[in-house]
């Protein structure tokens, strides 16, 4: 397995796990907000505001994972070192 294949697998698995985690987190946040509004409709404004801030923070995880995956794929600072190490191991 060469270096670029490993980078593709790492980026793919990283993005999948990050998307799964943020999806679960956002689902639980919205579920709790809907339950809160159904119990106390008068507080829907505060609940909605808090939920939106929470969703933005949860979504930032997916953005960070995307940035790390793009760095792994296109701007990997250890590319030359890893390629030399893999060539040495292959010999």
Curated annotation (Swiss-Prot):
Pfam families: ATP-synt_C (PF00137). GO terms for cellular component: plasma membrane; proton-transporting ATP synthase complex; proton-transporting two-sector ATPase complex, proton-transporting domain. InterPro entries: ATP_synth_csu_bac/chlpt, ATP_synth_F0_csu, ATP_synth_F0_csu_DDCD_BS, ATPase_proteolipid_c-like_dom, F/V-ATP_Csub_sf. Gene3D superfamilies: lithium bound rotor ring of v- atpase. Its main location: membrane. The keyword Lipid metabolism does not apply. The chain crosses the membrane at residues 4-24, 53-73. Keywords: ATP synthesis, Cell inner membrane, Cell membrane, CF(0), Hydrogen ion transport, Ion transport, Lipid-binding, Membrane, Transmembrane, Transmembrane helix, Transport. Coiled coil: none annotated. The record marks 59 as: Reversibly protonated during proton transport. It is found in: Cell inner membrane. GO terms for molecular function: lipid binding; proton-transporting ATP synthase activity, rotational mechanism. CDD domains: ATP-synt_Fo_c. It is a multi-pass membrane protein. The keyword Ion transport applies. F(1)F(0) ATP synthase produces ATP from ADP in the presence of a proton or sodium gradient. F-type ATPases consist of two structural domains, F(1) containing the extramembraneous catalytic core and F(0) containing the membrane proton channel, linked together by a central stalk and a peripheral stalk. During catalysis, ATP synthesis in the catalytic domain of F(1) is coupled via a rotary mechanism of the central stalk subunits to proton translocation. Key component of the F(0) channel; it plays a direct role in translocation across the membrane. A homomeric c-ring of between 10-14 subunits forms the central stalk rotor element with the F(1) delta and epsilon subunits. NCBIfam families: ATP_synt_c. F-type ATPases have 2 components, F(1) - the catalytic core - and F(0) - the membrane proton channel. F(1) has five subunits: alpha(3), beta(3), gamma(1), delta(1), epsilon(1). F(0) has three main subunits: a(1), b(2) and c(10-14). The alpha and beta chains form an alternating ring which encloses part of the gamma chain. F(1) is attached to F(0) by a central stalk formed by the gamma and epsilon chains, while a peripheral stalk is formed by the delta and b chains. Belongs to the ATPase C chain family. This is ATP synthase subunit c. It comes from Trichlorobacter lovleyi (strain ATCC BAA-1151 / DSM 17278 / SZ) (Geobacter lovleyi).
